[in-house]
C-alpha cells in the first residue's frame, strides 16, 4: 500500500493516492498528444497545513521540463522535487526527487527515477519501460505491464492533456500506472468547471477527484479535490484533502515559460 505523509510532496504523488481497481479495463488513451505544456516550463507549488482558518507553510515542490534525448529519441525530461521547510524538518524531513523521460510524441515514459528521503526512510528505484514489449525493468527485476503505462511524473503531465470537453460530470477517466513494481488501475472523477480562490489568486478552473486509499493519513474515499486551470495549459492550481485534524492544501504559487497565457487567472491575491 502506498503511504502518504502530511508533508510529503502531494503534488508529485497526487496520482499515488488512488485506490487500485484490478478488474478495471485498460484505459483507451493511447495516442494522446501534448497540447498543454512545453520545454522550459517551471511550476512552484507550496504545501500548507490548514486548521481553524490559518495556513501554515509546510513545504515546497517544483516541476520542471526540459527537452532531452533518450536512446536517440526526443523526450521531455520532467523533474519533480520537493522538500519540507526547516521548521517541519524537526518533525519529519522530506527531500524527494522524481524524474521521468517522456516521449514527446506519445507522452509515454521511457525511464522513471525515484530518489526520496522521507523521515530518514530512503527509497531509490530506477525503472526502464519498453512500451512495445510491455515490460518494465526496475532495480528489482523485470515486470509485465499493460498498454500505455504511466509513471508518477508522466501521469501528472498526461492528466494535463485530457480533453475534459468529452466528459460529463461524474464520469470516471481511467489510466494505468507502474509504481513500486506493481501496476495500478486508476481513475479520476470529472466534476465540472467552477471558480476557485487559492493563495495565488482567483481562477476559472476544472475540478476533479481522485479516490484515496484507506489507511493513509487521508480519509478513504473521494475526499481529495484537485483543480486545474480552465485554459489550454491545464495547470495544476490546487490540491485539497482533509486529514484527521485540519486539512492539507497544495497551491500553485509561481510559474514561468507556460505554453499559453494563463487566461484562466481572474485576479491575483
Sequence positions of predicted segments:
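Acidic, serine/threonine-rich low-complexity disordered tracts
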Residues: 21-129, 167-269
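Hydrophobic, well-structured mid-protein blocks that either form specific transmembrane helices
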Residues: 121-163
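Bacterial N-terminal signal peptides that target proteins for export
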Residues: 1-8
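Hydrophobic h-region of N-terminal signal peptides that target proteins for export
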Residues: 11-20
Amino acid at each position: 500500500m502506498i503511504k502518504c505523509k502530511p508533508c510529503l510532496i502531494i503534488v508529485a504523488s497526487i496520482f499515488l493516492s488512488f485506490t487500485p481497481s484490478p478488474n478495471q479495463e485498460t484505459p483507451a488513451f493511447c495516442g494522446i498528444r501534448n497540447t498543454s505544456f512545453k520545454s522550459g516550463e517551471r511550476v512552484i507549488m507550496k504545501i500548507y497545513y490548514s486548521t481553524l482558518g490559518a495556513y501554515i507553510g509546510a513545504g515546497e515542490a517544483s516541476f520542471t521540463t526540459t527537452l532531452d534525448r533518450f536512446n536517440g529519441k526526443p523526450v521531455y525530461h520532467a523533474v519533480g522535487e520537493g522538500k519540507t521547510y526547516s521548521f517541519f524538518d524537526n518533525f519529519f524531513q522530506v527531500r524527494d526527487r522524481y524524474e521521468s523521460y517522456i516521449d514527446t510524441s506519445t507522452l509515454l515514459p521511457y525511464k522513471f527515477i525515484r530518489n526520496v528521503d522521507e523521515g530518514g526512510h530512503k527509497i531509490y528505484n530506477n525503472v526502464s519501460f519498453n512500451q512495445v514489449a510491455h515490460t518494465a525493468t526496475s532495480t528489482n527485476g523485470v515486470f509485465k505491464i499493460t498498454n500505455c503505462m504511466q509513471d508518477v511524473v508522466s501521469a501528472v503531465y498526461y492528466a494535463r492533456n485530457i480533453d475534459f470537453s468529452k466528459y460529463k460530470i461524474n464520469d470516471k477517466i481511467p489510466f494505468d500506472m507502474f509504481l513500486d513494481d506493481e501496476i495500478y488501475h486508476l481513475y479520476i472523477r470529472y466534476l465540472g468547471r467552477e471558480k476557485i480562490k487559492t493563495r495565488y489568486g482567483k481562477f476559472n478552473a476544472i475540478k476533479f477527484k481522485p479516490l484515496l486509499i484507506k489507511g493513509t493519513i487521508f480519509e478513504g474515499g473521494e475526499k481529495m479535490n484537485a483543480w486545474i486551470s480552465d485554459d489550454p495549459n491545464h495547470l495544476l492550481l490546487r490540491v485539497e484533502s482533509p486529514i484527521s485534524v485540519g486539512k492539507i492544501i497544495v497551491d500553485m504559487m509561481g510559474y514561468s515559460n507556460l505554453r499559453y497565457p494563463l487566461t484562466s487567472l481572474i485576479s491575483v491575491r
